[in-house]
Every structure is written in structure tokens, then in C-alpha cells.
């Protein structure tokens, strides 16, 4: 594996996640619409959010921060699995790098823009709306104060309140009698953090992926967040949250139900902080399929693995894991964790094991010599339920050392509870199945 000495690679080239539910009828006539994705460290987001005090991107502290952030995602999943009513949602803002990916969205008529955090672990797309205590401005890194748009149904001519008797409202939501509108409350994992408001129908402005590009006003349902509490008052989600989960209130599901797209989306994470999310992406012709495990009360993107192959070592072992593009690394409990890391370590013969005086998030790291420009690691592939194999394209991360030189680490973290496949994996979800294919491009836009 070759690496340029003047770069810090987060996951080598491009990381992609495809997520979709394809309806039984033909989707050939459906369109594909997209939005740009911006990393927390990208120039676009840095214009809004101060990165002073954040760990240097690609450093060991940076990966430690992402791992800490992932632990919060895992805690959310455990709380959701144990819940018998409404799921506990993902947001927990105590860690500075928790929100790593954002998108600038345009909503309403006339259109206003909002910088929203992306989350595959929650469903509702909500914006601060007609609120007295929400965040209205930010101090940018340029020392300028930036005003944020606050959504209001009364100023958007295309808006319409969702009535209490609407099918969108459902039995799990309340009713605002004063407004005669469907009420909602989303409670997040962070202490006393929630958003409460009403549901509104409006338009989301999207661009097609065709050339020349066409602009489309896509009808959606969003949360008008009247009351924000906890970390949302500290600007943790800045200007709203864009849920990408499975529920029918999520934007991918709404676009499909309106007949605008196949019920799918792909997320491409580029190495330069700029990526792309495409709604209606149907993947590649050569992709392979594995069925989802949908027995949970609150379904997630959960699959079964039946075999692990690390280089020449093959182990028959069945376990389940959830795909989550919002999680940075892969977390496995035993015996799957030990099978992979011990087999990987036994086949690394050219580089010495890295021994740190303090505990690092990765247990298996190796030191590269000052003159070394490449390294070779054993191939890792997983056999999924149904028999198809998935080849992991980037099992390691490259980390610069403070005193000079590099180490590379197997980017698998030991879990004491659930298994999660992080965003170094590429999947597409189709007809209640996950589809996966090799990543062959580094260009997200």
C-alpha cells in the first residue's frame, strides 16, 4: 500500500455508504438528486465553526476523539435496543468532534439556507423554527459573527402545517391544539437535550445529477423546532439536524413515497473534506446482496456475517453487525475481534509492532521506517448472509508521529457489547437487503 509522505490519510482515498429501500415497482423513471457533504475540518464548515482547540486532523488525538464520539453512538444504539417505546436518538455533543459531517440545505419559498448536521441514526429532519432560545449566530474563525437563518412557516409561501389527523402524524406523536398541527418531541442521548415542535410540509431544493443540472423543489416533511434544550442551545447541531434513518418521516423515505426517487441514498466521503449525498442512487450493476435482520423493535441497518478471511486464514464464525456511516471505525466484540486482529498480526512480518506508553484506541499498530513509502497488509474479506463476499478496501489508517515518522493501525476497535461496521464500508440497501461493491473512484463530486 503506497502513501504520500506529505499527507495524513483518514481512511485512504474515498469512503462511501449506500443506503436505500427500493419499492417493488420499477424505479427506472426515478431521478437522482444530491447535496454536498462537508467535513468538520473542511473550509466551508470552518467558516461557520471555530476549529481552534480541536485535535489536528489525522493525529492520534484526532482518532481518539472520533473513537470517543463513536462510543456515544454505541450508547445510543444500546439505549434504543432496550427501549420499548420511542428510541433514544444519537446526538451527544460533549465531544468536540461529535458532529463530523454537515450539509448546506435550502428550504422554503423564498429559499433560505441552513447548515445541518447529518445523522443516519435518527429519522426526522428538523430546523430551528419560531424559537426564542435557539442559536441565532456564531463566531466564525475569521472573527466575524455569522447570522443563522431561523425557519418559520409563516414566511414560506410553500409551507403547510401537518394536521393532527394526518397519516404522517401517527399514533406516536401528539397534537398541538392551539396550532391544529401534529406535534413532535425528539429526545437525544445527551443530558436534557431535545427538540420539540410541530411538523410542517415544505420544499427542499435539490439539484439533479444530470448534465445540465436541473433544480427541483422536492416536497418534504420537516420538524419546526420551536423549543431546543441542552447541547442544542450551545450550537452543537448548529442550525438543525438531517436524519437519514429508516422511518417514513426521513427525507429518503419521503422522496421515495412521493415518487421522486428510488428509496435510496449514497454518501461519498472524500479525503479533502468535501463529499456528496445522492438520493435515489441505485448503485452499480456488479453489486452483491445480503438480507437485513429486521426483527428489532426499532429496525436499523443490521446484517449477518458468516465467515472471516484475513489473508490465508479463514474462520467460520457467525455474528451480526449494524452498518452505520456515522461511526468512524469498526467495533467488534469477541470472538470476531480476536479472530481478525490476531490473524492480521500473525501475517505482519516486515514492520515492528508499535508500543505506546499510553493506551491507544487501536491495539494493533506498526512502525514504518523513515525510508519506507509503502507497506503490505493481508486482504480482509467477510462472507455475508446469503454467501456473498465483501472485501474491505481500507482496513488500516496511517498516523503521523509527533517526533516524525508514521505508524499504521488496523482500524478495528474492541467492543464489549454490540458490533458496528463503520463508514470505511460501502453498502447499498435495496429491497430489505444490503448491497455492496468495490470502491473504484476517489471523486465524490
Model-flagged regions — what are they?
Residues 243-245:
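C-terminal reverse transcriptase regions that engage the nucleic-acid substrate
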Residues 375-405, 410-428:
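C-terminal transmembrane module of eukaryotic multi-pass membrane proteins
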Residues 2-220, 228-234, 252, 256-257, ...:
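Zymogen propeptides
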Residues 353-387:
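Extended C-terminal subregions enriched in glycine
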Residues 197-201, 238, 317, 375-376:
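Short, solvent-exposed loop/turn segments enriched in Ser/Thr/Gly
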Residues 113-124, 311-344:
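Active-site beta-strand/loop microenvironment that shapes enzyme catalytic pockets
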